[in-house]
Amino acid sequence: QCAWNDEWNHFDEDKQNEIKARQGVRYPNLEGATIMDPETMKGMPKDGKTIGEIMLRGNVVMKGYFKDKAATDKAMAGGWFHSGDLAVIHPDGYVKIQDRSKDIIISGGENISSIEIENTLSKHPSVSIAAVVAKPDEKWGEVPCAFIEMVKDKPTSEKELISFCKETLAGFKVPKQVIFCELPKTSTGKIQKFELRKKF
């Protein structure tokens, strides 16, 4: 059941916020909801670290896409609905979404969550909005590149933001480039990452 556990009241505020940031557990009417490797279709360990794709199965999941067999076959491969959301599963069964599969950055064989980098950058006082996408790289295949909208009258620099990220992120997750610009958005304010990828 997705409900607050009284034992969590004893944790400090940071730990409680970390718990609240998780997305929850399997919906009772679902036959199955788990995290799997989309290639092997094997379940991921419940360690809160290993990233896999959220897979769903049950009579509340769609049967397929209207008149699109190819898309249906891809989405339902292996008898599970492939959500496109990448997540980890914790020992208590709670899931935390890390990224969309199309937004993950694969650098030197390592999967990097763009959301993790964006969350780090957003903690800097000069950053209003951050968006991170994969930039092609000859050596690593892809590397993180950050696009930043700054807070008005609070200037910063590429060097400062990279140093800021190095304080909390593993070296391979630190953006290799920071670009300051107005971010392209939809009418509802969602950042259009596909437009940012076109810049490379």
Regions found by a protein language model. Name each.
Residues 9-20, 142, 163, 197-199:
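Short alpha-helical interface patches
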Residues 178-181:
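General small-molecule cofactor/ligand-binding pocket signal
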Residues 24-27, 77-79, 139, 174-176, ...:
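Short loop/turn motifs at secondary-structure junctions and domain boundaries
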Residues 1-94, 101-104, 117-118, 153:
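Conserved AMP-binding/adenylate-forming
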